[in-house]
A protein has these predicted regions:
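Active-site and donor-binding regions of nucleotide-sugar-utilizing enzymes
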Residues: 12, 17, 73-166, 171-174
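Conserved donor-nucleotide binding/catalytic region of nucleotide-linked donor-dependent transferases
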Residues: 188, 320, 325-326, 333-350, ...
Length: 377
């Protein structure tokens, strides 16, 4: 099988989901390519789209709440969204790519490429089988205007949510959000601490704002610093992502008991080494944490799909959600002290999240391609 994974740099979760499927495809002996489709037209265009998104997340996240509300209103209107029409300009680019690089299936963990493929289909251009992977625990605006052969959704109990928005029930596959195999490794908290060079007698709180360093990390750290300074057994680990300004600011503070990192390729290990993970509720990062079985405290949700992610996780007992930073020390202390509460959270994660999502998605892709070949016989 020859697969193409199309993603976009607007949020690390989409790319991470795509890379998880890419990794699994390679393991299964398939040919697979992953790319950002906009780079085929212009690297400047691709970079501009990515930078605009990242800058908005870091500086004016509330703008996403406004856009999300507009999207939910717009989706009720009897015509297609601006996103659909903007992506029409990519049809010729992708048609040329397929002529030069034929593939059996296109897998898309991002809405924009799905809009491109839908445009091509509606213009009578022959395209491969298509699969969309939802990376949030909600049907995000305009997903319903795409026309893919299969839609992978995070969980079975979200089926009615997607059907209600217009996705055909027979196209829905509740296989979960795919995660990198590193999150599936089974090492104890003590083993991970030793591998990372951390103190085995300390309790670590891991704080991130997602791959782009969004969220009120500074305020969160300020609230938790006094708490951790009063507790000799507690230390903070902060991962800033690509937010260089935040990283430099925290480095200059050089606060005791606080370890500051930029990017890390050992996120799974840091999660398993931690007693608590504080993060904004991105769909992919939350799923990764649940796969690792680490207690989660969601905060600083970007209004819109992240609010829905937080509600889903809290509603299923997989996390605690709190946006008031002055309440964080009390909640953190409760989680660290109450081992039963932490254990219950991890049990709920284990019962709700499909760890084998990447493998299941690859099996579905194989099935779709096999059916396509059978139909052509």
């Amino acid at each position: 099988m020859n697969a193409l994974i199309l993603s976009s740099g607007t949020g690390g979760g989409h790319d991470a989901a795509g890379k998880a499927v890419y990794e699994e495809m390679k393991k299964r002996g398939h040919q697979v390519t992953m790319l950002n489709p906009y780079t085929l037209k212009s690297t400047k265009l691709s970079g501009r789209i990515d930078r605009t998104y990242i800058s908005t997340v870091q500086h004016v996240p509330r703008a996403f709440g406004v856009v999300y509300k507009i999207g939910n209103i717009y989706r009720r209107l009897p015509f297609r969204s601006p996103i659909y029409f903007v992506n029409r300009g990519m049809t010729n680019v992708m048609q040329k790519y397929f002529a030069e690089h034929p593939v059996d299936i296109v897998i898309m963990p991002h809405l924009f490429p799905a809009e491109i493929m839908t445009n091509m289909k509606h213009h009578g251009i022959q395209i491969p089988k298509t699969m969309f992977i939802a990376t949030d625990y909600v049907c995000t605006p305009f997903t319903e205007e795409t026309d893919c052969d299969a839609y992978v959704i995070p969980a079975a109990d979200l089926t009615e949510e997607f059907v209600g928005k217009g996705i055909p029930r027979e196209k829905l596959y509740p296989l979960g959000i795919p995660t990198n195999s590193s999150f599936l490794e089974e090492r104890t908290r003590k083993q991970e601490k030793q591998l990372l060079g951390l103190k085995t007698d300390k309790k670590y709180i891991l704080i991130t704002g997602g791959s782009m360093g969004g969220g009120k990390i500074e305020k969160t750290i300020e609230e938790l610093q006094n708490f951790s300074s009063d507790r000799e057994d507690v230390e903070l680990i902060v991962i800033c992502g690509s937010n260089q300004k935040l990283y430099q600011k925290l480095q200059e503070k050089n606060s005791p008991g606080v370890t500051v990192l930029e990017h890390t390729d050992r996120m799974a290990s840091y999660m398993r080494a931690s007693h608590l993970f504080i993060t904004k509720p991105g769909g992919l990062s939350s799923t990764e944490a649940a796969v690792c079985h680490v207690p989660i405290l969601h905060t600083s949700a970007i209004p819109g799909c992240e609010s829905c992610n937080a509600d889903y996780f809290a509603g299923h007992g997989m996390s605690i959600s709190e946006n008031l930073t002055d309440e964080l020390p009390r909640i953190v202390d409760e989680v660290l002290q109450n081992t039963d509460k932490s254990a219950e959270m991890m049990t709920c994660q284990n019962n709700t999240i499909n760890k084998a999502a990447a493998a299941d998605i690859c099996r579905l892709a194989e099935q779709l391609v096999s059916e396509a070949f059978s139909g052509n016989d």
